[in-house]
């Protein structure tokens, strides 16, 4: 219901994405893995956001301008808790705890200089002990040749 994937349009002489694009994609993918590994009932939204946000910045990319993820329910942006930073515009939503049965997106992004934005958006179900991905994760860049 709310997924994003990263695609790269190859030039005629290319058979894969350039190293800078691949590196950005790998950082996004790893940031999702790290956040998901800590996403479980009782965690506050800002704690999960901070994991992905810090990892991306440590890898040398700029901070992304939005929260890591939002709840999904009857609407694309639904529910209470937000996987986001403690920014004024989000109010108390990042301070709320994640609950079993919630569904969240995990959608970090980064800008790859001279190429554009890389992002992946996954959806997860919060389980008793963690989270479960609701669709097959994107593990490689989709290429258009």
Regions found by a protein language model. Give the residues of each.
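Active-site neighborhoods and metal-handling regions in enzymes and metal-associated proteins
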Residues: 1-145
